[in-house]
Amino acid sequence: MSILNPRTSLEAGDSDDACCAAMASACCLNTKEDCDSPSTALPSGTPQSLEVEEVQGYDVEFDPPLESKYECPICLMALREAVQTPCGHRFCKACIVKSLRDAGHKCPVDNEILMENQLFPDNFAKREILSLKVKCPSQGCTETMELRHLERHLGQCQFASVECSQCQGSFPKSRLEKHMEHECGRRKIFCDNCGLAMAYEDMSGHELICPLAYVTCEYCQTNLIREQMPSHYSMDCTMAPIPCMYYEFGCTEKMQRNDLARHLQDFTQAHMRMMFQTLRSFSTTPTSHISDISFCDPNQFEPVPLSVAPAHPSHMPSHQDCSQETRNLRETIEQLEGRLVRQDHQIRELIAKMETQCTYVNELKHTIRSLEDKLLDVDGHHCNGVFIWKIKGFSGLQKTQEEEKPVVIHSPGFYTGKPGYKLCLRLHLQLPSAQRCANYISLFVHTMQGEYDSLLPWPLHGTIRLSILDQSEGAIIQDQEEVMDTKPDLLAFQRPTTQRNPKGFGYVTFMHLNTLKQRQYVKNDTLFVRCAVNIHLDVISPRREGFQPRSGDGAQ
């Protein structure tokens, strides 16, 4: 039951019958109901007003349209398993039973006392409804039939949607066989090369790695199967580039395999000089260092120019020169080792200082969070039961909801007075795929553990007014508003045993997201939600049971 309530004036209500009918219709989807917080709520897409959808009325299109006398005042659909009350009203059996258990033993239309055992089947209405003509709900089907024959028709209707067992998509029954055999991306096929079974959509990836698929050599353009290609590159391909066989001695030339023989013939003298330089390096290197020489590094030995004559033994370095060079290297190593020790010590000191600073920063962050929480708590103490929740960045929340990601946020806690009950609000943007509540704003109130819980009577008794404020500038301002009375028998209003009661109380379909565009409910990307709580009992000075005031002892 959503209403538009102007702040500037109060509109007169409709007749009692219309009001009662609206209240009854709200019991199913559009009114307050006990709802778990997201950690314990039903999955998104499941109607939170009923755990099993089938027990509601018949949600089909009648031809001609359904008469109001056959409509359930609760679910607003055609009566299913119609029952009648002593006061003459008809309901779906499941709808009225749930209403009696959740909302109390009274008729949702006229509030007359009503017990479950007073309900009796209305076979006349049931027979009349089953005889009404309905249209097939399958898109493309134009057949009509009596309601009693609808289920049998759906089992045979070629336009009825059925699920593909391979890709879980929905398709008309007439197209399912063609889809599964020729169109489904998950249909089973076999690789023509290796015979491996796979899904059709995986074939493109398999073709890139299939070991028996034919591929073309990028050098000689020979066609071979993929698993033969490595050996072809390394041994057979005449066009593949290979290094010179003297690359370990310093030759950096690369050529095609069929040009290797010519290269060896043309560069014979150069290869001999490279080998000579390598041997000469061995003769001048201490024995302990010979093992450190790598023959795999072509840059280690530079080729000798062709104009350079062979080295004469008199040009070779003496033993004294080698000893002096060794001493110089040792001194350099000692200096570097000392520098390394000093730098290691400095690094350890810097790490210790950084850890100290990190600890200090974490303590400051904790202090800041604590102060922020205290500031919010102070604001909650002084709201006196009228709390306005400012939600910034609402467009970002809507974008997340459009991506089928759940959006659930909680407000800071606030008190109904001092002393008073501590409450908070929960806002939930229903996903586009949710049944019967898609794209709705859900709004709930949760009790929280507060400072005065031991001084207050439980459960909570009072009236709660929830509003989404209109931020338009003008004389006429229309807030989206709902008013509800607490229900002491629900867990949502019992004294909480955790920081926040997991049970909430409010509206699954408080306001549709499209309604936000009709007025300026969102301004500067900000939405305002107002909650006003009126406690029915005097919680400021509760009278204890059995307390008797004592008269004074007299003047002294």
Curated annotation (Swiss-Prot):
This is TNF receptor-associated factor 6-B. It catalyses: S-ubiquitinyl-[E2 ubiquitin-conjugating enzyme]-L-cysteine + [acceptor protein]-L-lysine = [E2 ubiquitin-conjugating enzyme]-L-cysteine + N(6)-ubiquitinyl-[acceptor protein]-L-lysine. Transmembrane segments: none annotated. It is an enzyme of class 2 (transferase). It is found in: Cytoplasm; Cytoplasm, Cell cortex; Nucleus; Lipid droplet. The coiled coil domain mediates homo- and hetero-oligomerization. SUPFAM superfamilies: RING/U-box (SSF57850), TRAF domain-like (SSF49599). It comes from Xenopus laevis (African clawed frog). E3 ubiquitin ligase that, together with UBE2N and UBE2V1, mediates the synthesis of 'Lys-63'-linked-polyubiquitin chains conjugated to proteins, such as IKBKG, IRAK1, AKT1 and AKT2. Also mediates ubiquitination of free/unanchored polyubiquitin chain that leads to MAP3K7 activation. Belongs to the TNF receptor-associated factor family. A subfamily. Its main location: cytoplasm. GO terms for molecular function: signaling adaptor activity; tumor necrosis factor receptor binding; ubiquitin protein ligase activity; ubiquitin-protein transferase activity; zinc ion binding. A zinc finger (RING-type) spans 72-111. The gene is traf6-b. It holds the Pfam family TRAF-mep_MATH. Residues 318-356 form a coiled coil. Homotrimer. Homooligomer. InterPro entries: MATH/TRAF_dom, TNF_rcpt-assoc_TRAF_met, TRAF-like, TRAF1-6_MATH_dom, TRAF6_MATH, TRAF6_RING-HC, TRAF6_Z2, Znf_RING. SMART domains: MATH (SM00061), RING (SM00184). Keywords: Coiled coil, Cytoplasm, Lipid droplet, Metal-binding, Nucleus, Repeat, Transferase, Ubl conjugation pathway, Zinc, Zinc-finger. GO terms for biological process: activation of NF-kappaB-inducing kinase activity; innate immune response; lipopolysaccharide-mediated signaling pathway; protein K63-linked ubiquitination; regulation of apoptotic process; regulation of canonical NF-kappaB signal transduction. Residues 384-533 form the MATH domain. Pathway: Protein modification; protein ubiquitination. A zinc finger (TRAF-type) spans 152-204, 205-261.
